[in-house]
Amino acid sequence: TLFCLIVPFLCVHRAASLAGSQMQIDPSTAAVPDVYQLLVGVVTPRPIAWVTTLSPAGVVNLAPFSFFNAFGANPPVVVFSPTLRRDGSKKDTLLNLEKLGEFVVHAATAPLAEQVNLSSKEVPADESEVVLAGLGTVAGTKVRVPRLAEAPVALECVVKQIIPCGTGPIAANLVVGEVVFMHVADEVLDDRGAVDPRKLRTVARLGGAYWCHTSDLFELPRP
């Protein structure tokens, strides 16, 4: 049985399936904010890239991005997406990357969750979210962009490619970066020198205003 349920700005079809009744949404006809909310609600948990960039005026920009992941190790590559603002304009992070082509990704950890969230606030381009969050910086080793002094992990990166995926509000811009230097604090390592997730304590994003911890662990042997 198939019928159409109309909700504000979103045409939703409901159909029977083995998993029970379900919504069926066509992104080409649905409102962009609704598509966004559904997407971030189902693609979870999303790791957070806590990114510093440097403006031409020398202002250190800091912002979190949950459209993020690692995509290879030889060479080490990370990808994140600073989407366009709701008015279609580019965020400071993207503008800085287009000019300088360097950035640093930091681990977003539980002890720093409040600062991560605070750094998502939009401020004028001549103001630094690093100052707003009460954080310190350390000079980069291979890039001109400073890294956060408080973050236990920092990945210095150079931009390999920026791929625009649209021109409208919340359109993606895939930033492909090669990791050229890594900083990992001893305090998050185990006896073998590997990162211990129970010590690193990263946080991740869910839908809406929800976040999650990564401390509820289980292991599965690879087949």
Where are these regions (language model features)?
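Basic, polyanion-binding surface patches
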Residues: 20-223
